[in-house]
Amino acid sequence: MIDVNNFEYMKIGLASPNKIRSWSRGEVKKPETINYRTLKPEKDGLFCERIFGPQKDWECHCGKYKRVRYKGVVCDRCGVEVTRAKVRRERMGHIELAAPVSHIWYFKGIPSRMGLVLDMSPRSLEEVIYFASYVVTDPGDTPLEKKQLLSEKEFRAYLDKYGRSFTAQMGAEAIRKLLMDIDLDKEVDGLKEELQTAQGQRRTRAIKRLEVLEAFRNSGNEPSWMILDVLPVIPPELRPMVQLDGGRFATSDLNDLYRRVINRNNRLKRLLDLGAPSIIVQNEKRMLQEAVDALIDNGRRGRPVTGPGNRPLKSLSHMLKGKQGRFRQNLLGKRVDYSGRSVIVVGPNLKMYQCGLPKEMALELFKPFVMKELVSKGLAHNIKSAKRKVERVQPEVWDVLEEVIKEHPVLLNRAPTLHRLGIQAFEPTLVEGRAIKLHPLVCTAYNADFDGDQMAVHVPLSAEAQAEARILMLAAQNILNPKDGKPVVTPSQDMVLGNYYLTMEREGAKGEGSVFKDTNEALIAYQNGYVHLHTRIAIPVASLGKTTFKEEQNSQLLLTTVGKLIFNEILPESFPYVNEPTAHNLEVETPSKYMVPTSTNVKELFQERDVVAPFKKGFLGNIIAEVFKKFKITETSKMLDRMKDLGFKYSTKAGITVGVADIVVLPEKKEILAEAEKKVDRVLKQFRRGLITEEERYDRVISIWSEAKDVIQDKLMGSLDKRNPIFMMSDSGARGNASNFTQLAGMRGLMANPSGRIIELPIKSSFREGLTVLEYFISTHGARKGLADTALKTADSGYLTRRLVDVAQDVIVREDDCGTDRGLEVEAIKEGNEIIEGLYDRLVGRVAFKTVRHPETGEPIVKKNELIHEDLAKQIVEAGVEQVTIRSVFTCDTRHGVCKKCYGRNLATGSDVEVGEAVGIIAAQSIGEPGTQLTMRTFHTGGVAGDDITQGLPRIQELFEARNPKGQAVITEIEGEVTNINEADKREITVKGEMETKTYSIPYGARIKVELGEQVVPGQSLTEGSIDPKELLKVQGMTGVQEYLLREVQKVYRMQGVEIGDKHVEVMVRQMLRKIRVIDAGDTEVLPGSLIEIQHFNDENKKVLLSGKRPATGRPVLLGITKASLETDSFLSAASFQETTRVLTDAAIKGKRDELVGLKENVIIGKLVPAGTGMNRYRNLDIVSDYDQQAVGTEEAVMEEAVTTE
């Protein structure tokens, strides 16, 4: 018996007529489905029990044999085998066609495969197949040519002239005769010779034909199998017919399509038996051909066959295609048992690794576990009574549930799952009510809020799944964001506000200058109202018990506030006492300016000193990162919980609210606006006199009003009290920003109209004063545009993520070191003088390719093949090194993936990347997830003008799809000097090199970037604009393009304030550049003009070079991500992505084998993915839990029991 779940590869091919007959259990001869009175299947019909198996388990059609004991008996009365009814899902039938028909995929696809094999145009093929023309299949000794088309008239004429000495036929049988006559070897050799000389169109055609013919020759498929003699009929359960509750029947469209085929086939048989006139037979054959076409791919040719209500019927092809097709709906996305969903609410008292699960939900999810436990505790006699107990919710069930649920993690998922942090594991705690409780700190990762979001719960069942959930997916383990390695669980909103309020200082607060003997005394004083949280006090350094103070400091006093004492209690003991929001305080020590001798008059000292700033959101993030660096994950998650509790507690105690009185009115606003009005009038006067153009007038008016708004904003922020609640909220980073405040208290400013052009009439009112009707109307433009954009672009971003995942899903860390001899030189990415991504960011977590030495002393800072961590990167930058060569994904030589050294550190864990990590998918998610932010930026400003960017998502798509960019720059192909810039009539630039001089014409309206006499290098842009990466590939080769794409993608994201690790972009760009176009095949096996993997190309060349023959030549190609996904070696992965029919047609002709190396293919066939714990090296590990795994089987056990007892 073969193991269904264990196979090495999957192969697809054309089926020969005999193969189809061998699959079949019998011929379907009648179009009938079921008998309308008995509702039993008709004999020899589409649902026949004799062909497809019994409808009820262990029961034949006529009822002579019932029960299991007759298993395997074939009934002598009705001929039905007694077996399980589920064989109706797997047994096939067939229809013997009275005339051959062509398979529409091979005849109609682009390019037409049949046409390429026969070297005929699709038009003439269509004429022959659909009985419009005759084709000469054997010219005999007449002057006619083989494959020549003849109309009815010509055929009659030649028949009269030559008699029967030639044969011409029509329909699919003629094509089959031609296909059978083809000698593949002869054709292939002829084409190879033709390729030596052919040029242009002929060459392209020859290459295409050669590809198809080689495919047939190598795969063992016969070209004549593209014509069908026998039609397979799929099992009836896959095209079911069900009775609705009105006595009517609903049936799958396929049954209608099969019925049409059978009807026409039977009619054709009858006509042939009767010896009907040829014109009638031809018409019937054409109708049969059309019926089979509709069955295989309805709507591909001509008008689709429609059902009731003019709805096109879904054919076999449609069953596979698109989001609702077999691939994406059922193979890649399955619904799972043991899952539930509910609304989420905040659970502020949960620990980092916990979630609250509603009791009734938990009971249903853990039902089998509870049942097993009830039996093993002796609370129920057997599984059946246990089930009854659970269903009646008897009180003892809850205690058992509490026990079962301990130590059993569940997965929580929020849609849309944009990155891997969208599913995390938690330990459930039972809660009353019907809402899931979620820890407030994981909201950022899920992008969740509590305005009605819902989340799904899944239960990992097996011991292995539980272990993986606990070790890899527990929320407390996922503190860092995989896209940039920064903490993702930073406190937000209330928590930030509470900690901000707690660490504020205030001059002259109650009890300023008090000195306490230790923290406890200070807290007692605070609780009794002698001092305030913001009071500046002093405390002996020694009483804090911190290990980070120096010896001599222990005898001094520390100047701090009561709030900061409380705040520091949550930090680990060996962490510096945090007294000011600076990096020095975090990383090194508490600054010594806060230490004073015990004899100091503290009160007087405080009067001279300035107030220290409180801790804002960013600084809290830095604290978390620093704690993580020093103490690793467990301590960090504990500290996060303490920080959360502190934040909630003190934001509550602070009682910070927002009232209308908190929005201050700016007295100078009237004057500022009047001044701006005057300026605008002046500009208008100049315009009326014709001194300036309409454009200039518009631009000046816009800039006058923007300036006015900025002045108001600056004055507002200056006049604000530091204790104003709204100011505190925006300053701490909890909510809001300066622009929001200006709109509340100052003026709303300029707005854009729906087309994005700024309306020159500003909104002078603020929300505090209220808008006039016209102003209100103008602001609705921007707000509405924001909402529409968001809705549209979210879909765009999701689709981008899908394409990225698809192109990189098989990139996995495969080995420790690939031993490459190339590295990548990196330096800071700059745009003009502005640094977009510094060298430090580009080095952290990468491996040095060669030793990095100090430029002055020559001392080695980093050795070859050593990982560069934060401190080393800092040293390199401080030493003044500007360029470092690192190991990069670009230069990695590993097959189907990357190696550990070239990838470097795993950003999500902060340690070395493991073999088996699916870095391709992580990269795709890291680039795709911020894609939604790139677009949603317009949404939050309520459409205030000036925030709209042309960059963003469209630019990212342009780069990854390798499209010709808008506003393309002209680049130079040679190195040399700019000798001529002609801007007047011809608009051209001349570059003179050592060997040649080139002149480039400049498109109208392009701004020139170079100056006369400037030295330029190949690939440098001569005009402003984006470079076309395909052009760059020709000029600079692979390295140039890789660096360009990396730089440009980083630019777009960094401009939006999104940080993404370089390595993610590198993984993507590498996938776009892994193919090579063969120019000349040399003596290798590869086909000229074909696209093949670079590594495969190199292998073939090595083979021929070793035997002293001529190698192939090729040039690298840059493919967009969509194209690259479709060009993958795995047909399963490509077919489930896009263009399903084309991919499958192609794969079938080539007889492709899918080796199942990527993740997607394995998900489709239901195997473990070959990444992480699913890799072969881990496959044979057994995880045994003390809690045995019988529980899941109990549901089935109940069912079995129920069946036997009936």
UniProtKB/Swiss-Prot annotation:
Pfam families associated with the record: RNA_pol_Rpb1_1 (PF04997), RNA_pol_Rpb1_2 (PF00623), RNA_pol_Rpb1_3 (PF04983), RNA_pol_Rpb1_4 (PF05000), RNA_pol_Rpb1_5 (PF04998)
Binding-site positions, Zn(2+) 2 = C818, C892, C899, C902
Indicate which residues the UniProt annotation says bind Mg(2+).
D449, D451, D453
Q: Entry's InterPro entries?
A: DNA-dir_RpoC_beta_prime, DNA-dir_RpoC_beta_prime_bact, RNA_pol_asu, RNA_pol_N, RNA_pol_Rpb1_1, RNA_pol_Rpb1_3, RNA_pol_Rpb1_3_sf, RNA_pol_Rpb1_4
Query: What GO terms in the biological process aspect are recorded for it?
Result: DNA-templated transcription
Q: How is the cofactor bound?
A: Binds 1 Mg(2+) ion per subunit.
* Residue positions binding Zn(2+) 1: C60, C62, C75, C78
The signal peptide stretch is: none
UniProt keyword list: DNA-directed RNA polymerase, Magnesium, Metal-binding, Nucleotidyltransferase, Transcription, Transferase, Zinc
Q: What is stated as this protein's family in its record? A: Belongs to the RNA polymerase beta' chain family.
Role summary? DNA-dependent RNA polymerase catalyzes the transcription of DNA into RNA using the four ribonucleoside triphosphates as substrates.
This one is known as DNA-directed RNA polymerase subunit beta'
Q: What is the organism of origin for this protein?
A: Halalkalibacterium halodurans (strain ATCC BAA-125 / DSM 18197 / FERM 7344 / JCM 9153 / C-125) (Bacillus halodurans)
